From Swiss-Prot:
PROSITE patterns: SIGMA54_1, SIGMA54_2, SIGMA54_3
Reported function: Sigma factors are initiation factors that promote the attachment of RNA polymerase to specific initiation sites and are then released. This sigma factor is responsible for the expression of the nitrogen fixation genes. This sigma factor is required for the de novo biogenesis of both flagellum and stalk, and for polar morphogenesis and normal cell division. It may not be involved in nitrogen assimilation.
Keyword field contains Transcription: yes
Example GO biological process: DNA-templated transcription initiation
Pfam families: Sigma54_AID (PF00309), Sigma54_CBD (PF04963), Sigma54_DBD (PF04552)
PANTHER family, per the entry: RNA POLYMERASE SIGMA-54 FACTOR
Protein name: RNA polymerase sigma-54 factor
The organism of origin for this protein: Caulobacter vibrioides (strain ATCC 19089 / CIP 103742 / CB 15) (Caulobacter crescentus)
Residues annotated to bind DNA: 380-399
Motif RPON box, residue numbers: 471-479
Example of a GO MF term: DNA binding
Record's keyword terms, sorted: DNA-binding, DNA-directed RNA polymerase, Nucleotidyltransferase, Sigma factor, Transcription, Transcription regulation, Transferase
Compositionally biased residues, Basic and acidic residues: 49-68
One GO cellular component term: DNA-directed RNA polymerase complex
Length: 497
């Protein structure tokens, strides 16, 4: 076959993502702190932008019904703008990104390299994301990885998220669990059960409320926590004073045993969380606020304190436009004007989109707001996206690094999403975490060899309860919870007898 050169003209359709639309999409996933920093950089770069120092307008507010199926929130008036911002860019090719017609890989919550944030809003560098990959994990991230593997029920998982946020850099829990139970409207025993699970996480000793509990957790892990050790931990002040006679008397041991005990105590780590990368503490400011109104309605509104307010200085634009002489000066003024107008529009779209998504989440999870953490419903991104007519990727960006203040506390919007398993009777779906909780409950109820359930038997019991689940799924959940097989459980019971 002969090779030859020729020209062809082809017509086709393709997705074109301009740098400006790229910027608008990126703004969606920024936290209010990151957004404020970005706007500040734009104010310094663009002379036509100025901060609006006037009085804030009343917060945009919508109402959500308690019954999620009754009404649909109409929070965004500018539907055309909303559709622009909702462009699904997840499948744009690397080649398009290189030419500025695509967008870089979407990583919800990824770090932005602010040194490259100017120039019309192009985010072409992944340096910040690459740096994040090489950084050592934070203590909170390490704990959340273990939380996923723990396969807790929705209620326990929700409480665990709050407890993780309350752990300081040393690994200590800085939260009163009695107050937490009261705030969440749940039994104290539920919080205590969750804390007990979390105290089994690595590093050993994490989630302790004081030094004594921290050391006790580590000794229990080493199988060295006995009455003598408990007595020593109850009188650590004597150890600090080096009152050996007092310790011998209280612990009931001789000199040799006492020396061994002290050596073991000194080998422990009183700050188990210190080995992990720590983040500077930041004040948590909610992006959205929800309060209960009359007639079973929930009022959802934006927190105007977190919304950067910028204006285009039209007078200054007119003045510099008249003074522009060269083509380069005129181009610069035109670019600044276009960039300023787009930023103002993008910020408005961002605010409306956040409100729309948050309102739907409130309607879906009204049970949690009204009755407490045990009433969290199974919810995923697709459900919210379909309800408000947006793309899943948009909902994902909106819920990253955004917080909502509720009567039960401040939560990240992603807190309200839990997976589900379909009902065998066609009814409401079951949370996957709640199914794992049911499996654990069945195993915990086994008292003798005859009570031990095989995976097949567990499937039968769950199907009788309306949960449609396969045997391999039961086995997967059981293994994730580190529950031995039925054969192993029978053997352990026989040995215990």
């Amino acid at each position: 076959m002969a090779l030859s050169h020729r020209l062809e003209l082809r017509q086709g359709q393709g997705l074109v993502i301009t740098p400006q639309l790229q910027q608008a999409i990126k703004l969606l996933q920024l936290s209010n702190i990151e957004l404020d920093a970005f706007v500040e950089a734009e104010l310094e770069r663009n002379p036509l932008l100025q901060r609006d120092e006037g009085d804030h307008e009343p917060a945009v507010e919508v109402e959500a019904e308690r019954d999620a199926s009754l009404t649909q929130v109409d929070a965004v008036a500018d539907t055309t703008a909303g559709r622009e911002l909702d462009t699904p860019v997840d499948d744009v090719s690397p080649g398009e990104r290189a030419t500025g017609e695509g967008t870089d890989a979407e990583h919800a919550g990824g770090q932005i390299d602010w040194s490259r944030a100017g120039g019309g809003g192009s985010f072409e560098s992944d340096e910040g994301y690459e740096r994040a990959l090489t950084d050592s994990p934070t203590l909170a991230a390490h704990l959340r990885t273990q939380l996923v593997q723990a396969a807790l029920s929705p209620a326990h998982n929700a409480i665990a998220e709050i407890l993780i946020d309350a752990v300081d850099e040393g690994g200590y829990l800085r939260l009163d669990i009695v107050e937490l139970a009261d705030r969440l409207g749940c039994a104290l025993a539920l919080v205590e059960e969750t804390l007990s699970v979390l105290q089994g996480f690595e590093p050993v000793g994490v989630f302790a409320r004081d030094v004594r509990e921290c050391l006790a957790l580590q000794l229990k892990d080493l199988n060295r926590y006995d009455p003598a050790m408990a007595a020593m931990l109850d009188h650590l002040e004597l150890l600090a004073k080096r009152d050996m006679a007092g310790l011998r008397r209280i612990c009931g041991v001789d000199d040799e045993d006492l020396r061994e005990m002290i050596g073991e105590i000194r080998s422990l780590n009183p700050r188990p969380g210190a080995a992990y990368h720590s983040e500077p503490a930041e004040t948590l400011v909610p992006d959205v606020m929800v309060r209960e109104g009359l007639g079973g309605m929930w009022h959802v509104e934006l927190n105007t304190d977190t919304l950067p307010r910028v204006l285009v200085d039209q007078r200054y634009h007119a003045r510099v436009s008249k003074g522009a002489r060269s083509d380069q000066e005129k181009t610069f003024v035109a670019d600044c004007m276009a960039s300023a107008n787009w930023l103002v529009k993008s910020l408005d779209q961002r605010a409306k989109t956040i409100l729309k998504v948050a309102s739907e989440i409130v309607r879906q999870q009204d049970g949690f707001l009204a009755f407490g953490v045990e009433h969290l419903r199974p919810l995923n991104l697709k459900t919210v996206a379909d309800a408000i007519g947006m793309h899943e990727s948009t909902v994902s960006r909106v819920t990253s690094n955004k917080y909502i203040a509720t009567p039960r506390g401040v939560f990240e919007l992603k807190f309200f999403f839990t997976s589900a398993i379909q009902s065998s009777e066609g009814g409401e779906a079951h949370s996957a975490a709640s199914v794992r909780h049911k499996i654990k409950g069945l195993v915990d109820a086994e008292k003798c060899e005859a009570d031990v359930h095989s995976d097949d038997r567990i499937v039968e019991i769950l199907k009788a309860a309306g949960v449609d689940i396969a045997r391999r799924t039961v086995a997967k959940y059981r293994e994730a919870m580190r529950i031995p097989s039925s054969v192993e459980r029978r053997r352990l019971m026989k040995e215990a007898v």
